[in-house]
Design a protein with these regions (language model features):
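Conserved beta-loop-beta element that borders a ligand/cofactor-binding pocket
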Residues: 131-153
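Short alpha-helix in the Rossmann-fold core of NAD(P)-dependent oxidoreductases
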Residues: 83-90, 107, 126, 181
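Conserved catalytic-site region of short-chain dehydrogenase/reductase
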Residues: 76, 112-124, 150-154
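Substrate-positioning beta->alpha
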Residues: 92, 156-160, 174-196, 203-207
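NAD(P)H-binding glycine-rich loop region in Rossmannoid oxidoreductase-like domains
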Residues: 48-88, 96-99, 113-116
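Mid/C-terminal beta-alpha module of Rossmann-like enzyme folds, strongest
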Residues: 198-261, 279, 292-303
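N-terminal Rossmann-fold cofactor-binding loop
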Residues: 32-37, 51
């Protein structure tokens, strides 16, 4: 029986950890890449193409018993940018997997943001993708991961925040009582491999974090103060200033021919009051538990 896992998003910072985790467990991996790669190995084959390329997707999922869909659009200046990749691209991949005839399990890496689709274009696109994938997954076990904020080696989004924390400055982007949560990319990758390896994977949605249900800004302040052995100043950033920053980011990104990360739509996610996580079903269903707490990561600079 095939031991092949087809992976999208393998060139991204999370995807690189997923590839490493799967390879360490002895799986043969076939991964999608937009740019040509010359680093294939006996157990890792790169397929050049994109989620818009049906021929590449057919080659990607050929003989693959498992599909891990980690590719996604996280930057964008309008709703359509997210819909085309996160919704339509996901549906094309599942359709290719069904037509290939070998796929038994399909894992969609969504986002905790999908819990509140009304917040942003990104959140809504992930939620819609979840619903549409579920509707067309007959005959294939569909798993959905909703990881919270992911950080780790290669991350460019949370690293600046952690760097400033260790310099003694912590920008507070929402109210003091906001519930935050985090997960290290290594733990997320191990959760992926554990789900794939499970004897009886459940068709279920899983929220994932580092084991701490929620942090508040004062908790981050205390973690950073302990790590740097010095004071950390917590500086609230007013909403109007975040909006100005988002407008500037959007304008300059588009002028540079790039999609912006910080937009007014994204601000609604950043300032949402509750990103707490309950992950007991992941522990119960496929015996996964995280190994890297935020405290450990900050103290040992694992980002």
């Amino acid at each position: 029986m095939s031991n092949t896992v087809a992976v999208t998003g393998g060139t991204g910072f999370i995807g690189k950890h997923i590839l490493a985790s799967l390879l360490s467990r002895g799986y043969t991996v076939r991964a999608l890449t937009r740019a040509p790669r010359n680093d294939s190995t006996p157990h890792l084959t790169w397929i050049q193409g994109s989620l818009e390329d049906k021929n590449a997707l057919a080659e990607l999922v050929k003989d693959a018993r498992y599909v891990v869909h980690g590719a996604g659009q996280v930057r964008g200046h309008n709703e359509d940018v997210f819909t085309q990749c996160n919704v339509m691209g996901s549906l094309r991949l599942l359709q290719a997997a069904k037509e290939g005839g070998y796929c038994e399990r399909f894992l969609f890496i969504s986002s905790l943001a999908a819990r509140h689709p009304e917040l942003s274009w990104y959140a809504n696109s992930k939620y819609i993708a979840e619903q549409k994938l579920a509707a067309m997954s007959s005959g294939i076990t569909l798993g959905v991961f909703r990881p919270t904020a992911v950080y780790g080696s290669g991350d460019k989004e949370l690293k600046p925040l952690f760097d400033w924390m260790l310099r003694g400055i912590l920008p507070q982007l929402s109210t003091a009582e906001t519930k935050l949560s985090f997960i290290h990319a290594i733990d997320l990758a191990q959760a992926v491999a554990q789900w794939v390896s499970s004897d009886v994977p459940q068709a279920q949605t899983y929220e994932l974090c580092d084991g701490t249900e929620s942090y508040r800004w004062k908790d981050l302040q205390a973690i950073a103060a302990s790590a740097r052995q010095g004071p950390v100043r917590l500086i609230p950033i007013p909403l109007y200033l975040l909006k100005i920053m988002a407008d500037i980011s959007t304008r300059f990104s588009l002028l540079a021919g790039k999609e912006p990360m910080l937009t007014r739509s994204k601000i609604c996610e950043l300032t949402h009051p509750d990103w707490s996580v309950s992950m007991q079903n992941a522990v119960d269903d496929f015996n996964w538990s995280p190994g890297i707490s935020l405290t450990h990561a900050i103290h040992h600079r694992l980002f």
